Amino acid sequence: HREHEPYIDPSEFDADLKVIDTSLRASQDEIIADDRLSTIRAAIASFGFHLYSIDLRQNSESFENVLTEVFATAHVHPNYDTLREEDKVELLVRELQTPRPLVPRGYRGFSEATQRELDLIAQAAVSVERFGEQMIPHQIISMAQSVSDILEPMVLLKEVGLIQANGQGPTGSIDIIPLFETIDDLQAGAGILRKLWDLPIYRAYLRQRGDIQEVMLGYSDSNKDGGYFAANWALYDAETDLVEVG
């Protein structure tokens, strides 16, 4: 391996281990290859450099509040949270096509709540850079109720480099996962996804993620919302509708 340069990812490290494995077996040193070297390679395959993965998860209302303040600070829109849904989507799509950041790196003039959320996302980007893409594979949006709820965290992830804007559509290593929780949201979930997938920019992102859309359904909140029977019926209907729309 190149002297003094760190491995970019676990597969690069394993490629060097494979060379050692081949050399040992060619020298009839299978005992060594099958012992410690095999154990190291198994650990790399299982844990990479990150040991275990962490999901990002936040409530949709929090994302809206953060973006409202960020957009106002960046003079993009003074009151994002008052926009109609279609206008929100139009603005978010435009931002996902724009490579430039909304605020200068290191800017810390936000409210405490907004700064805390931005710091968390920035730290996630540092962790991915240090330990690899497997470190943080998912962004979960709890209480997802609209297309804009799903696009908002993507704009924030773009702000820290976890999603990149380019001419072919945004790219990134994080799966965007809406969590539909209340009975109303379970019933609306399939329709929300249809509208989301009709957006070329989101379809492009989904395509580079293997054309797989993961969705989460909330069991506890739907039970609290409508009771056991109504919640389970809504969950069954939601699962059926989501399979059909997929």
Kindly give the residue locations of the regions a language model identified:
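Secondary-structure-rich domain cores
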Residues: 122, 126-137, 144-163, 168-174
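Active-site capping/gating regions of soluble enzymes
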Residues: 127, 152-165, 177, 181-246
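Generic recognition of stable, solvent-exposed alpha-helical segments in well-folded globular domains
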Residues: 8, 12-15, 19, 32-35, ...
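Short helix/loop capping segments that flank catalytic or ligand/cofactor-binding pockets
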Residues: 52-55, 61-64, 149-151, 187-189, ...
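Acidic, His- and aromatic-enriched active-site or binding-groove loops in soluble protein domains
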Residues: 70-86, 160-167, 171-173, 197-206
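Extended, charge-enriched "interface" segments that sit outside catalytic cores
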Residues: 1-130
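Beta-sheet entry/capping signal
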Residues: 41-42, 49-53, 134-140, 173-177, ...
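Conserved short loop/turn motifs at secondary-structure junctions
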Residues: 56-60, 138-146, 175-183, 231
